[in-house]
Amino acid sequence: MKILFCDLLLLSLFSSVSSSCQKDCLVCREKLRPTLDSFSLEMCILECEEKAFTSPLWTPCTKVMARGSWQLSPADPDHVAAALDQPRASEMQHLKRMPRVRSLFQRQKRTEPGLEEVGEIEQKQLQKRFGGFTGARKSARKLANQKRFSEFMRQYLVLSMQSSQRRRTLHQNGNA
């Protein structure tokens, strides 16, 4: 039973490894959903990985993907992931035509700071305080509370060290 469980675990680990063929076939299935009723994801992956002979299933995938902004390539998984995350150019043009969105795009272009300004802004927002970073807007009261708490901790540590030293000396002298 343990051997069967270990085999199953190993197989699940290997199947969870991300490959571009899996992504390509998933995208293809989504694009061809209305036209292909008998789409087999497993066969598509096998054909993509060139473990099976090219069949009529992989050819429409490559054609449909070539027409769009998608590209099927087992050697370049980053391109497919980037294409999945990026909106299409036509969608972006449609959004830019809308007045509210267009004004947001223009504002973003105007307010993009330079590299030097970004460094200055980051330096203003973060200040090193008591071993951690706190925002520049943090109130003086909170910082005073941190100082007071750290002072309490110091006193506690000093007292606990002194008491442990007393116990050790008493124990060594045989008075315990």
Swiss-Prot record:
The keyword Zinc does not apply. InterPro entries: Nociceptin, Opioid_neupept. Pfam families: Opiods_neuropep. Keywords: Cleavage on pair of basic residues, Disulfide bond, Neuropeptide, Neurotransmitter, Opioid peptide, Secreted, Signal. Residues 1-19 form the signal peptide. One of its GO terms (cellular component) is axon terminus. GO terms for molecular function: opioid peptide activity. The keyword Chloroplast does not apply. Residues 20-95, 169-176 form a propeptide. GO terms for biological process: chemical synaptic transmission; neuropeptide signaling pathway; sensory perception. It is found in: Secreted. Specific enzymatic cleavages at paired basic residues probably yield other active peptides besides nociceptin. Belongs to the opioid neuropeptide precursor family. This is Prepronociceptin.
